[in-house]
């Protein structure tokens, strides 16, 4: 059975071609944060718009979704340490190519200095600072934010982020 409303389909993109395809055929674009402003403002979002234009689609109704990597904790050191659980994200592509054994990937990630492991994350212990960090993605043009927290205690994150950061985000952007 088909649902009454069509299920929205998004295309994930990390480069220009996939972003253009998303603009041509999908209900939205999805990508991940932490890769530098130029990727979003000069490549992905313009290609997405260009794809929609080429397909004669009105892009104003299309979603621009981003998974924002956030590590928020009232204890800043804990927020920093939590990024260690996803340290592999900070490995350069050439260090991940051809690695088939997850234990080898874990070994490579564990060898990274903490500052490097944390480099793809927005890290803060201050709710207002965190809102400012996240606001960059709204300014780039993203319309749908998904938050990804790295630490093992997801309930702790949800309670703190949900009570301290989300109300400020909603007040500012809702």
Regions of interest found by a model, annotated:
Residues 1-174:
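Active-site-adjacent structural elements that line small-molecule/cofactor binding pockets in enzymes
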């Amino acid at each position: 059975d088909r649902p009454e409303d069509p299920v929205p389909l998004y295309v994930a993109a990390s480069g220009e071609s996939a972003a253009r395809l998303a603009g041509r055929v999908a209900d939205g674009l999805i990508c991940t944060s932490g890769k530098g402003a130029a990727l979003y403002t000069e490549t992905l979002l313009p290609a997405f718009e260009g794809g929609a234009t080429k397909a004669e689609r009105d892009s104003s109704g299309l979603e621009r979704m981003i998974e924002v990597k956030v590590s928020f904790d009232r204890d800043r050191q804990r927020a920093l340490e939590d990024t260690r659980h996803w340290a592999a994200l900070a490995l350069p592509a050439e260090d991940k190519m051809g690695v088939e054994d997850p234990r080898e990937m874990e070994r490579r990630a564990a060898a990274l200095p903490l500052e490097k492991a944390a480099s793809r994350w927005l890290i803060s212990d201050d709710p207002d600072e965190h809102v400012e960090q996240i606001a960059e993605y709204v300014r780039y043009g993203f319309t749908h934010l998904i938050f990804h927290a790295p630490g093992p205690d997801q309930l702790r994150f949800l309670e703190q982020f949900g009570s301290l950061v989300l109300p400020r985000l909603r007040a500012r952007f809702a």
